[in-house]
């Protein structure tokens, strides 16, 4: 661990020098890249330096204790030792956590896709409830939501909806929502009062930037068509909706607002994100073969959570967490679940670091 910390500190010092170089300062891309890297390393370096200082103070105090002959002086040094000693394991634990490789996607915006799955109309209604839940959570975080694609269901909710959440750290908090969500409740149309079980799937994709993926124009098939609303009614009179297909992968994205130019931009952004995500999924699958994560496999068919309305209970199956606050959670109060999943992921990564897997 300490060898790694020395390397981190050396790199931090090197970045300080680079950021003072006039050639770097005049290069916007390099300046942004190095500034971000330095910011990412700063806390680790500060904690490591604090650790070295405390350790040195403790060693000096122990040495003074051996030389002190006066009882009052010994008592004073003993107090200092008792103050310094517990700080060592605390700082070591912090350093271990800071050495855990940060997910490079954590600071990104998020593209979320929710689909009604098993359960017919109830599944679509539940998909709408999940969209509302994430919208409320995003509002509380001060994030902005922009709807990309929708396919509204006839009896409420969505057959599918894709939207982007714009805000720093959105992916770090919402990445754990990836998977199948199950709901148990009595539908409003159910006269016999029987509990029905339905599911909706949630896909969480980090928004991709142009520099991260290159898509050739010749690999795209772009089509325009007339957008239709629920029940087949035409909502615009021109062929403004856009469908873009990435020919090598077969991945498709659509957008159906009134402006064809905006639709093309939105559909292309969504397509790039989906193509990038497909590559990311491949890489993550390789890692999960080496080690199963404490917060699930990340597979979108994996059942991750159950929402039991009659018992006001939400259970996250990946970490065995049960909370009797469903009424609050569906209103966007996701903090308790997200915090527990974050801790589980950190613990898992720390174990992997100790085992030499990371």
From Swiss-Prot:
The modification N5-methylglutamine is found at residue 233. Coiled coil: none annotated. Methylated by PrmC. Methylation increases the termination efficiency of RF1. InterPro entries: PCRF (IPR005139), Pep_chain_release_fac_I (IPR000352), Pep_chain_release_fac_I_sf (IPR045853), Prokaryotic/Mito_RF (IPR050057), RF-1 (IPR004373). It comes from Macrococcus caseolyticus (strain JCSC5402) (Macrococcoides caseolyticum). Belongs to the prokaryotic/mitochondrial release factor family. It comes from the Bacteria. Its main location: cytoplasm. Peptide chain release factor 1 directs the termination of translation in response to the peptide chain termination codons UAG and UAA. This is Peptide chain release factor 1. HAMAP family: Rel_fac_1. GO terms for cellular component: cytoplasm. Pfam families: PCRF, RF-1. NCBIfam families: prfA, PRK00591.1. Keywords: Cytoplasm, Methylation, Protein biosynthesis. PANTHER family: LD18447P. It is found in: Cytoplasm.
